[in-house]
C-alpha cells in the first residue's frame, strides 16, 4: 500500500533564511521555489538522492497557514510531516475510512514562483489521532 517516503516537510517561519541555511548545509540549491495558493503557504524543495526535503512557511491567509503558524509559534522551525507515496491513494483512503472518520483526498498544487510552472498531486491528510 505505501510505496515510498515521498518527502519530509519542515515548517519554517522565515523561508528565505531557512533556504539559505539548508543550501549551505546541503551544498546544493533548491530545485523549486513556489507557493500553494489554496493553502496560503510558500515552499522550497531540495532534491536528495531518493526523496526530497520541503521547507514550508506561512505566507497568506489559508488553511495551511492556519495549521502551521501555531506550530511554529509553539515549537519553532521543526519537522512537521512525512509524506508517504502510494500507487493507489483511493485504495488507501478506502482502507483508512473503515476505521477513521473524515479521511478525504484533497488535490494539491504548487506554482513555481519564477516560471509559473505547476506541480499537482493528491493528498490524503491523516488525522492527528494517528
Label each residue range with its predicted role.
Residues 29-71, 117-130:
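Conserved short beta-strand elements that form part of the metal-binding/catalytic scaffold
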Residues 1-33:
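Short, extreme N-terminal leader segments that mark the start of a protein/domain
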Residues 26, 50, 100-101:
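Structural motif
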Residues 15-17, 53, 62, 89-91:
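Generic "edge-of-domain/loop-turn" microfeature
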Amino acid at each position: 500500500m505505501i510505496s515510498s517516503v515521498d518527502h519530509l516537510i519542515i515548517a519554517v517561519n522565515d523561508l528565505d533564511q531557512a533556504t539559505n541555511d539548508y543550501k549551505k548545509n546541503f551544498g546544493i540549491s533548491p530545485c523549486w521555489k513556489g507557493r500553494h495558493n489554496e493553502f496560503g503557504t510558500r515552499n522550497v524543495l531540495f532534491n536528495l538522492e531518493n526523496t526530497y526535503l520541503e521547507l514550508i512557511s506561512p505566507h497568506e491567509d489559508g488553511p495551511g497557514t492556519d495549521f502551521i503558524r501555531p506550530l511554529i509559534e509553539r515549537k519553532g522551525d521543526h519537522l512537521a510531516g512525512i509524506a508517504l507515496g502510494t500507487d493507489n491513494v483511493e485504495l488507501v483512503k478506502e482502507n483508512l475510512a473503515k476505521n477513521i472518520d473524515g479521511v478525504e483526498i484533497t488535490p494539491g498544487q504548487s506554482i513555481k514562483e519564477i516560471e509559473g510552472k505547476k506541480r499537482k498531486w493528491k493528498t490524503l491528510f491523516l488525522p492527528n489521532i494517528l
